[in-house]
Amino acid sequence: MSGLEQLTDQEKKILERVNRKMRVAPITFREASAYIDHLHRHHRATIGCKFCISVLGDDGDIHGVAVCGRPVSRRLDDGFTLEVNRVCSDGTRNVCSMLYGACCRIAKEMGYRKVITYTLVSEDGASLKASNFICEGEAGGTHWTGKRNRGQEIPAEMKKRWVKNL
């Protein structure tokens, strides 16, 4: 009896997810928004974007998406800074790191000098660290203040700003 035959069904499913070959591919804003609305833990899709990308498995299934756009903070919107507004995955290993890395490569090709993104203070930022982002510390507030953003169900928690100079 081989070692694989002794694995439980759950362990086999985990192994299948780890061993998949994945690739980055473009995705429409509409498709990315639908994915985010379905799977994101605490945010809805964004209003607009500069570009969207996805990570596809060798079976063609979407395992994660990223939406990039202008910085939400007017103070940081200098024309050379791109913000990764949303990253969402189905939990497949390394997908978020792949998305952040691809976003940075694309941003550099487009002429951006810096990429920023935010996480909740309660999130550890492991995929950002793996993609060589640096935590600048706490930023923003616990809720949106603009009229346009009222009523969004966003956790009342401080954010951490992460930056990567290109």
Each model region followed by its residue ranges:
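Acyl-donor binding region in acyl/amide transferases
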Residues: 23-26, 50, 56-57, 62-65, ...
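Short amphipathic alpha-helix that is part of the acyltransferase structural core
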Residues: 6-46
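Short beta-strand-to-coil "C-cap" segments at the C-terminal boundary of structured domains/repeats
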Residues: 163-166
